[in-house]
Amino acid sequence: MKVEIVELVVLLFSVTCVDAWLQGADCTRVADHKEHAPVTEAVCYLRCLSDALNKLYSEGEKKLLVTEEVYANASLILDDMEGRAGESSTYLSVIRGVMEEQTDRLEKLISYGNKMGNLVAKAGGLFAALEDSLKEVRKEIPGALIKTNKYYTSVAEIVRTVWEDVGEILWKETEAKCGSQKVEGVGEIQTECGAHTCPFADNGVAASAVDKYKGHCLYVGRNSYLRHCFNLPRGRLYRHGPVNTLGDALEWEENWSDYMNFELTVKVQKIFGPLIASFDVGIAPSTLAEMINNITSLQSRFNEVHSNFTSILFTTKLKTEVYNTDSTI
């Protein structure tokens, strides 16, 4: 009998604990509830998300622009190299018959022609990789940029409204009453944002940073201390803004009980996972810089070889034959 009573007590205790464990139990929690972090840190946690989205947008935009620029420059270089290499091949086929007694010069011309062909092939290999990267970037990044901008706007709006609620609006009266308060100004955020509030700061905007969030989500809860006059307009704002934009990546609940008036869960993985994957396509800007440098270096070597080729080609005895090809060399 005693055993049954003990089991019943344990069961009731467990049910009570589960019932008391509010929304977001499996997420990183920021709430003025029990032992969890103070809600003033919500500004830091949420601003971390908006800053990360802003950084993701900037890096994605840079990747798109750099890829386009590098591809355009590489295309011009390769077209020039291929054009001159093709002309050189034409000259060789025309003048072979008149150089039977100039074996040494003919062999040098053939050697230079082969070198130019090899350099063009190497540049072409790099260009092919750039072309593949450009296709991926053009397919993924423009849409991801639009989505990132929408997400950033929504999260930044949430940051602004939460900032108001942690007391950064300066009121003329000690206790503001809805409809009668007079705003004197906006204060500075007093909360110092510790490193723990922003996994993206140390890990970059990457999947490893998303993994730092418990359950890959962030829960923000605010006690009834919240100013009710902010809740109604905020509810309309959220429903037509962030909730509509973020979809199932955001859970916003207005609980008018005595326990919690503000509950917000941001599913970090659903926001950042697809975006990080989209911006990860293609070749990184740092690698693109190396590739265009290599292509430019190949062009310089090509120019040297081509100069040697033309210096032999334009000897007195070969000028007529070269001119007969109607070449622009």
UniProtKB/Swiss-Prot annotation:
The keyword Mitochondrion does not apply. It comes from the Eukaryota. Residues 1-23 form the signal peptide. Glycans are attached at residues 73, 294, 308. InterPro entries: ESAG (IPR004922). Coiled coil: none annotated. Keywords: Glycoprotein, Signal. Not known but may be related to activation of the variant surface glycoprotein genes. This is VSG expression site-associated protein 221A. It comes from Trypanosoma brucei brucei. The lineage of its organism: Eukaryota, Discoba, Euglenozoa, Kinetoplastea, Metakinetoplastina.
